[in-house]
């Protein structure tokens, strides 16, 4: 297991409000357009966190398959492809040496579109060793 996945498992356990998908709302209209324009019927949320955002909001989207290696309920990366793969507030948490593998995992599952929402600032979250959670 990668050290960073273990760090995020721990962080999710300790911080109840962390990983609730709040960043997704800032990207919604762009994702709405992609879903509409590509007529996407199947979605994968890669790095979904706890996935709570889908329980609270009515997105008018096909219900996405949820994947997040730090969340036991969603930690199995699905095989196969999806019309669209979205990943918001994820890539900046991936160590640089792991990025090619993660990009491959995302793009190899996308048939019609990929949407990456990537923060370019420091995170509020700090890992147990004092490292800022936005490691890339």
Predicted region positions:
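Conserved residues at the C-terminal ends of beta-strands
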Residues: 88, 97, 117
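Short glycine-centered segments of the SAM/dcSAM-binding site in methyltransferase folds
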Residues: 112-115
